[in-house]
Amino acid sequence: MATTKVKYPIWLDKSFTVPTNLAYAVYKGNDIIYTGMPKGNDNTTNIYLRDILKNYLSPMLVASDDGYLIKNRDQCGNFSISVYGEQEPRYEILTWWDWSYDNDFYNLVNRTDGILSQVVNTHWHPDQIIPITFYNGTNIHDYYYNRWEKDGTVQSDELNTYDTTYPVSTLTISPVSYINFGIKIDNSLAISWPEKDKRPCASGSLYYINQFGGWDSFLLEYNIVESVDVEKQNYQTGADYLSENFDNSYVIKSLRNSYKTNTGWLTEGQSYKIYHNLLTSPMIYFQNFNGNDPQRLIPINFTKTNFEKKEFKNTHHLVNYELEFKEANIRLRD
């Protein structure tokens, strides 16, 4: 039995080959969750793991204007799928602790489980949450939220350093040699503790679906300028000789918060992840650490995404994105 692990979200992928003379399907119980046919002009075709798993791992967040409070961790679930018509599935093994397509030598040498932080510049904040969706055997869209702090609190000392926890969600893929090769996928949670981790200065965090259907976050470490847009609908009343009455009255008033911030200078690789994942994401939420309810998830829409670039003689450059976004929902007042 060969066992490998895939970090969540699926920034790294796996593939296995299917001969051209075999049809292919993936089942969960009696339900077909993915189908594919080999290409006619090749001897084999590649089936990618992300195509099978993205519907199970992509988050289904529900956040109303009243906000959504972060819940405690629930019991993790596991499920199994089977690949039919394949005799010896071959996997393209990639380093599962790597968040990008480059080798993370620090994690390779010093850690066996990696760290689960936002993938752009690996900065993390104790108030950040990690939403994960898994299949529990009955419902695909079970999910839980966490505030990842040691024993529910942040431990500090005179040096203003903090002991924090890094959650690691792994997917274990085990091809088993039966009549049909099965792929068992266990969504498990392991927690490791670094000795010290300085608490970063940050104002909030963005949570978004990446291009693989997984869930990522980006820590906003610079000032956030907040404003409120107020729109009013009014109606004209008839002539009234009583001075205390209003000739022009408002029927309803709507309020929508707007925010402005920037990412700071990012490298080319970090900028690529922002551009291809955050700015084009179909679902984005904002958590305001300094708001009235720091545990609230706010659905937002980007309204402006300008950037400035520093270019150097070695042809490399740094990019700073100016982000402006609004709450996706309005608040109404009579």
Mark where each language-model region is:
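Extracellular/virion structural assembly segments
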Residues: T133, S188-D334
